[in-house]
């Protein structure tokens, strides 16, 4: 028998009927065999073996969210290391790309059935997946979704003022290689109403409503795939981290703080034992 805590190679290569997870929850040990696992678990084992070695797993909807969270974890880990606290690795955390919204619920549910602590992080613009997400939630999966009707790009843009939108467009230029390309992306959204520049304050001075500017930029970023790979997600995450305390991003940060709380759970301080303390009568 081989017991591993860190080697995904063993998880990948072993016959699945020979695999089992072992969880210790407050002294109660639970062993769950993967024998007879369905096709979904087989795919998870092959594509994301590290998830089966984790204590806590965040299933992110896609590459954008995956990269965004990786960048956030790097920043949070750095600060926690400076503070002398545990990192995400120390907490046994794995971030998994769910490969799309329809996969998030079933994947999170399958991992939860193995006894793992699981969170699902996804968009909130597709009602067709609500049932599978609710099913996962009933098993104890922590579900973190953006505001109703929003995807990642829409959530971020929803609170930005003109200067914040212009700053986001500058990030788009870095990823799309030129200002002209980003301008073409924007004008492809509303070809009958082109914008003259990447300065959103100029748009507004010419009559564009702020909400319309937010929607156009969010749609362009989504449809032209500015952040639709892990590197793009990381770039977006880095931009959020640099502006984390700005009020314009408060609605986005509120959801990221939920993920942070899941990744680094608070534990009771056992340094002070007052069980024998006597009170004055």
Which residues are covered by each model-predicted region?
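Switch/communication elements of ASCE P-loop NTPase nucleotide-binding domains
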Residues: 1-50, 250-257, 261-281
